[in-house]
Amino acid sequence: MAKARRRTAPRREVRTTGEFERWLGGLDAERKAAVAGAIGRIAHVGPTLGRPHADVIHGSRVRKLKEARVDRGMRLLFAFDSNRNPVMLLGGDKTGKWTRWYPQKVRLAERLYLDHERSIGKEAQCLTQRGVGRTSSQMSR
């Protein structure tokens, strides 16, 4: 009788942008630990990670753009690149800026993602028409 093989998760290399690194550097130890936990979950689960931990940003030109919900208003915008590695694009706290945060940050995240794809020799093939950058939970309201 053949032994059942255990499936192991593919090894993913987490990538970060300078924008993300600068933001992360300004956080206290407790928030950095929360961000590290979110990144670990993203890397372990992969592109299928969904709610309540992550949600797709609808209306973005980058189909793969998602947000991770770290705590209350803290969000990470990320995407999986053409090599299926998670790219942490930027982070921020949208507390008190609920409607203004997304349009500004989504545009920046799109640019950072396209820059990343070019840097690894890929031309992003995941562009759609620009929208306003809303999560699925916002669209259902």
Task: List each language-model region with its residue ranges.
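Basic, Lys/Arg-enriched alpha-helical interface segments
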Residues: 1-74, 82-86, 93-141
